[in-house]
Amino acid sequence: MAEFQGIIVIHKEKGFTSHDVVAKLRGILHMKKIGHTGTLDPDATGVLPVALGKGTKLVDLLTDKEKTYEAVLHLGITTDTQDMSGAVLKEREVSVTEEEVKEVLRSFVGEQMQVPPMYSALKVDGKKLYELAREGKTVERKARPVCFYEIEPLEIHLPLVKIRVTCSKGTYIRTL
């Protein structure tokens, strides 16, 4: 059987890790040389470019590019995972206007220093941060430079705010 070469675009469903998608493709295509171009959270849905065969040589070119995400912010809730999959730690009433929300979103545009969340696939000493977090451990993470090129509010129905974010690689939307 001929090996596939190139890049394919997969629509990742909620509940699967990026690694799950690659593992499934390895089984379907009977190939070992397959890789994705960046980790999407298990709860995220959307485009996951996957490199096959010689296409894996292009991964660095793709991962250095800006990325665009759509997300829904739920104002007034703090969770242990910084997303809605986690346990609620704090809840408070939201008393802001749409204009104040837009102003805060605009304030994030540009260069920022961002601390990666504990619930992320970033590795420390060979172990993924989310594995350590599930064990109840917290480790110090260094702030990293990221850039928000654009943050556009798509819908505002307080306390929910749907946004489109165009940002640099390595940016965690959940930390907004």
Placement of each model-derived feature along the sequence:
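Catalytic/RNA-binding core of pseudouridine synthases
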Residues: M1-T175
